[in-house]
A protein has these predicted regions:
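N-terminal cap/lid segment of alpha/beta-hydrolase-fold proteins
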Residues: 2-42
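Mobile cap/lid helix-loop segments that gate and shape the active-site cleft of serine hydrolases
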Residues: 18, 164-199, 205
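C-terminal catalytic histidine-bearing segment of alpha/beta-hydrolase fold enzymes
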Residues: 36, 220-268
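Short beta-strand element of the alpha/beta-hydrolase
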Residues: 44-53
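Catalytic nucleophile-loop/oxyanion-hole region of alpha/beta-hydrolase
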Residues: 60-62, 66-67, 80-116, 251-256
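Primarily recognizes the serine-hydrolase "nucleophile elbow" in alpha/beta-hydrolase
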Residues: 100-173, 191, 196
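Acidic catalytic loop of the alpha/beta-hydrolase fold
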Residues: 168, 214-218
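Short beta-strand/loop motif that positions the catalytic acidic residue
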Residues: 203, 209-211, 215
Length: 268
C-alpha cells in the first residue's frame, strides 16, 4: 500500500492487504484505517492514531474518530482513525489491530511526511484502554504476517487518553468494557494484567490524560490510577480533570480540553 491521501481527502484501507489474522465471519471490513494528512504548509510531522470508544462492543467513529482527525489535521497533525475489531472478538485482537496501525504509519512515514519518531496513539473511553494497552504492552507476535510493515516498531511515541477505561478490577472499572474485551472463560489474572495501572513501566511513552469530574460512566479515578503509576515510574505525564462534562463529551463546543491537547502536542 503506497497510495497517499489526495487533495485533502482521507484515504481508507484495511490494515492487511490479504488475509487478516484471526478473522472470522463477524465485523466484515474491519480492521481498517482512515488517514487524514495536513496541508504541507501546516505539517508538524506528528501523527496520531485515534481509537474511538464504544465499550469494546461498538465504535463511536463519527464523534470520537473522524471529527477528532479533522480537528488535528486543521492544526497541522496527521491523524488516522482506527476501526478496530470488538466483541465478539476478545483480547488480544484489538491490540493486534492497534499495533498493526502504528507499524503501518511508521512504514508510510516518508511518503506521508510523518516523523517516524513522532507517532502517537489516542483513545476515548474503551478506545482509551486500547491506546493505553498499546502504550504499555509489548509487541504481540501472534498473527504477524512478516511483511515489510511487520518489521516496524509497534511502540507509540506518546499517548493521549481521553476519559479512558484503565482498570478492569478496581471499583471504578467499567464492567461492560471488561466483559466485552475478555473471553467469558478468561482467568482473573488476565483482568489484572489488562488493568493498565499495573502495566506501566519506565518505558511507557509520555502520556496526556483527560477526564471530567462529572463522568459517571467511566469515573475519573481511572485516569488518576494511571497517572499515579506514570509518576511512580517517572514517565512524563500530564493529567487534566475538568469540572464539567459528561462521559463521551468528545470535542464539545468550547470545552478547553482540545486546546490543552494541542499545547501538550506542541511540547512533544
Amino acid at each position: 500500500m503506497t497510495t497517499a491521501p489526495n487533495n485533502g481527502l482521507p484515504l481508507t484501507f484495511t490494515l492487511w492487504k490479504d488475509q487478516t489474522p484471526f478473522t472470522g465471519q463477524a465485523l466484515p471490513g474491519l480492521p481498517r484505517l482512515t488517514v487524514y494528512l495536513p496541508s504541507e504548509e501546516l505539517n508538524s510531522g506528528k501523527a496520531v492514531i485515534i481509537c474511538p470508544g464504544g465499550g469494546y462492543g461498538m465504535l463511536s467513529v463519527p464523534k470520537e474518530g473522524h471529527r477528532i482527525a479533522r480537528f488535528l489535521g486543521s492544526q497541522g497533525h496527521a491523524a488516522a482513525v482506527l476501526e478496530y475489531r470488538f466483541a465478539p472478538y476478545s483480547h488480544p485482537i484489538p491490540l493486534i489491530d492497534a499495533q498493526r496501525a502504528i507499524r503501518t504509519l511508521r512504514h508510510q512515514a516518508v511518503e506521508w511526511r510523518i516523523d517516524p519518531a513522532q507517532i502517537g496513539i489516542m483513545g476515548f473511553s474503551a478506545g482509551g484502554h486500547l491506546a493505553g494497552t498499546a502504550a504499555t504492552f509489548p509487541r504481540i507476535e501472534a498473527g504477524l504476517v512478516h511483511d515489510a510493515i511487520d518489521s516496524e516498531s509497534s511502540r507509540p511515541d506518546f499517548a493521549i487518553l481521553v476519559y479512558p477505561v484503565i482498570s478492569l478490577t478496581h471499583p471504578c472499572a467499567h464492567l461492560g468494557s471488561r466483559d466485552n474485551l475478555l473471553d467469558k472463560h478468561a482467568e482473573q489474572d488476565l483482568a489484572e494484567q489488562l488493568s493498565l495501572e499495573n502495566a506501566v513501566t519506565a518505558q511507557t511513552p509520555p502520556t496526556l490524560l483527560i477526564h471530567t469530574n462529572e463522568d459517571t460512566g467511566v469515573p475519573p479515578e481511572n485516569s488518576i490510577l494511571f497517572y499515579q503509576a506514570l509518576r511512580k515510574n517517572k514517565v512524563p505525564a500530564a493529567l487534566h480533570i475538568y469540572e464539567k462534562g459528561a462521559h463521551g463529551i468528545g470535542l464539545a463546543a468550547n470545552h478547553p480540553w482540545g486546546k490543552a491537547m494541542l499545547q501538550w502536542l506542541d511540547n512533544r
